[in-house]
Regions:
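Primary recognition of N-terminal secretory signal peptides and signal-anchoring hydrophobic helices
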Residues: 5, 21-174
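Sec-dependent N-terminal signal peptides of Gram-positive bacterial secreted proteins and lipoproteins
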Residues: 2-23
């Protein structure tokens, strides 16, 4: 009985780093964070659209199943990151020590710092026009839709008339 308990504890401790960091390891997070320190910070405000934005992913309208409505940051369409990522089947992890979100989707590994105009995509820094922001009332992180969608292999089209963003997968995830 005592051996089983000790074995369980040892296995849990061995697996902790794997489950906590998945395919994005601490070294990669620290490396990205060091590079993000050189990136310009931004102060943009989240604002609601005057009308509801429709979001269609691979021909499926997900507008009504989103927990948080898309919003605008400095005029750029932004989505709640976890909400969007979960709709496409991506894994999301918050790295509080670095104020950074990690996303794993197929072969894509993305790290997104809050309030920085850049993201880390498969080991490369990609500049963004707008930084990811945390909505004060809901503690939800918003990121420009086009940036995250393209980083995860989606083509983005916007239809002004119907106020619809259409995302089409351009890669196989498995």
């Amino acid at each position: 009985m005592k051996k089983n308990r000790i074995l369980s504890i040892v296995l849990a401790l061995i697996m902790l780093p794997v489950t906590a960091f998945g395919a994005i390891d601490r070294k990669e997070i620290d490396s990205a964070n060091a590079k993000f320190q050189k990136t310009k910070a931004e102060s943009g405000e989240l604002k609601e659209f005057s009308r509801d934005l429709n979001l269609v992913i691979d021909k499926v309208d997900v507008t009504k199943v989103l927990k948080h409505k898309p919003m605008a940051i400095n005029g750029s369409t932004s989505v709640a990151l976890r909400d969007f990522a979960e709709r496409i089947g991506a894994k999301v992890t918050w790295y509080g020590h670095a104020r950074m979100i990690g996303i794993e989707f197929g072969k894509s590994h993305v790290l997104i710092p809050v309030d920085k105009k850049a993201m880390w995509v498969n080991g490369k820094i990609i500049d963004m026009k707008i930084a990811a922001k945390i909505h004060g009332k809901t503690s939800t992180t918003y990121i420009p839709l086009r940036n995250i969608a393209e980083a995860l292999g989606y083509k983005v089209d916007f239809e002004e008339e119907s106020f619809t963003a259409r995302l089409t997968s351009q890669q196989k995830t498995k």
